[in-house]
Design a protein with these regions (language model features):
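Short, flexible active-site-adjacent loop segments at beta-strand->alpha-helix junctions, enriched
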Residues: 9, 59-60, 83-86
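Conserved active-site segments centered on acidic
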Residues: 1-52, 62, 99-113
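Cofactor-cradling patches in redox/metallo enzymes
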Residues: 59-68
């Protein structure tokens, strides 16, 4: 399953998520940001590539809907509601990501069996 994690600048939250979940078997994971200053900017190619898109805040989903409406039309875009107040691999950020993403991945894996 191909997972794409998106935050604003692709420095702290989405990079943490990418590095955390790419360690798990069965997942191909990438990350990007919506801001012009993002380390890796979200683009059409990444959105088409992804099976599931996780965004950190509602604003990120809104930006995707405005800029890439056709590319995400048939995609599952999940808002994690993780605020921009954590640094890379912050213990609390890792805990929030595990608590919010793992149950969703487990459910998706059950549904695909």
């Amino acid at each position: 399953m191909k997972l794409l994690f998106i935050c604003s600048r692709n420095i702290w939250r989405s990079r943490t998520a990418e590095d955390l979940f790419k360690r798990r078997n069965g997942y191909d994971v990438r990350s990007a940001g919506t801001a012009a200053s993002a380390r890796i900017k979200v683009n059409q190619k990444l959105l088409i590539w992804a099976d599931v898109i996780f965004v950190m805040e509602r604003e990120h989903k809104k930006r995707l809907q405005e800029k890439f409406p056709l590319d995400i039309k048939s995609k599952e875009v999940i808002v994690l509601n993780i605020p921009d107040k954590y640094q890379y691999m912050d213990e609390k950020l890792v805990e929030l990501l595990n608590d919010s993403v793992l149950p969703l991945l487990d459910k998706m894996n059950e549904d695909s069996e």
